[in-house]
From Swiss-Prot:
It comes from Arabidopsis thaliana. Residues 245-293 are annotated as: Disordered. This is EID1-like F-box protein 1. Signal peptide: none annotated. Residues 16-68 form the F-box domain. Residues 250-259 have a biased composition (Basic and acidic residues).
Length: 293
């Protein structure tokens, strides 16, 4: 609900809008006509703190509700207000792939710049496959991997992102806290700047994740922040010929052979980059380490 309250600019004495602002209802109608264009919303936010506050409270919320109406309705159901105050971060997550940096969050050897994504589909079913069996009553929406092909030794890299419903009361958060998993020492969420937990370090990445993401086993890593934003990386398996496909437990999916169409040594390098160690490697789900150390 739009409150009929007048605000004064708190940006600076030299701000050009010191003589008052347009009514919020007028701005709402203007941006509704513009279909909640995210670039224009971001531009308006740079004008002054009053516009920035209005964009965070109203415009980004309307953008999210328009871009993913069913998902937003579910995230706010059952009295859940966990995304209140984070609409801008959620809006960015819907349309922006954060990429990865060399030696950054994912300890990757490639540099993939962040970029906007024209169209993204978020799936609750895909999110469920990324959760361990004991946590599958949690609700997680995850997008299909954003494909970045031919990344040298890394192969075909997939970057994905998602959002938990009511993360503060989720079983995943409870498991992470019970296992005393530490926050990442330096990296933060690219969407809300909150601290991050590694779900690989928490040992709660199920085998079903690689099947549903069509990625190599042991080459998947994802993090979740305090606000429930999830971001991850995987090495995508190449499409297999029909005779090479291995049926999985899920009749709707097939598991790809790791030695078909893609050098196995690159798979091992990617796995060792995530898990650290020799070619045989340590058991899966070990904490990320730098193989050069």
């Amino acid at each position: 609900m739009i409150l009929p309250k007048q605000y004064c600019c708190t940006h600076s004495p030299s701000c050009q809008c010191t003589k008052g602002h347009l009514n919020e209802d007028v701005l709402l109608l203007v941006f509704q006509h513009l279909n909640w264009n995210p670039k224009l919303v971001a531009t308006l936010s740079c004008v002054c703190r009053w516009f920035d506050d209005f964009a965070k409270r109203v415009l980004w919320k309307e953008f999210c509700k328009t871009r993913a109406p069913k998902m937003m309705l579910d995230l706010q159901s059952s009295g859940s207000h966990c995304i209140d105050g984070n609409w801008r971060a959620l809006g960015k997550l819907l349309i922006y792939c954060s990429g990865c940096t060399q030696g950054g969050l994912f300890n990757s050897s490639v540099q993939i710049p962040g970029h906007f994504v024209y169209r993204t589909r978020f799936s609750r079913t895909l999110g469920r496959s990324l959760l361990p069996p004991q946590c599958r009553t949690d609700v997680l929406y995850v997008c299909d991997p954003c494909e970045h092909l031919d990344q040298g030794e890394e192969g075909d890299v997939g970057l994905f992102r998602g959002i938990f419903k009511s993360f503060p009361t989720s079983k995943v958060r409870k498991v992470i806290i019970n296992k005393a998993v530490p926050f990442h020492p330096s990296e933060v969420c690219p969407y809300c700047k909150a601290k991050l937990w590694s779900m690989l370090q928490a040992k709660i990445i199920p085998q079903s994740a690689c099947i549903r993401l069509e990625a190599y086993e042991d080459c998947i890593e994802y993090f979740v922040c305090l606000n429930g934003h999830l971001l991850g990386i995987c090495t995508l398996a190449p499409l297999s010929d029909s005779e090479d496909a291995i049926p999985s437990e899920d009749n709707n999916h097939t598991e790809k052979k790791q030695d078909n169409g893609f050098p196995r040594e690159n798979v091992l390098k990617r796995r060792n980059s995530l898990l650290g160690g020799s070619e045989n490697g340590p058991p899966p789900q070990k904490r990320l380490t730098n193989p050069n150390q």
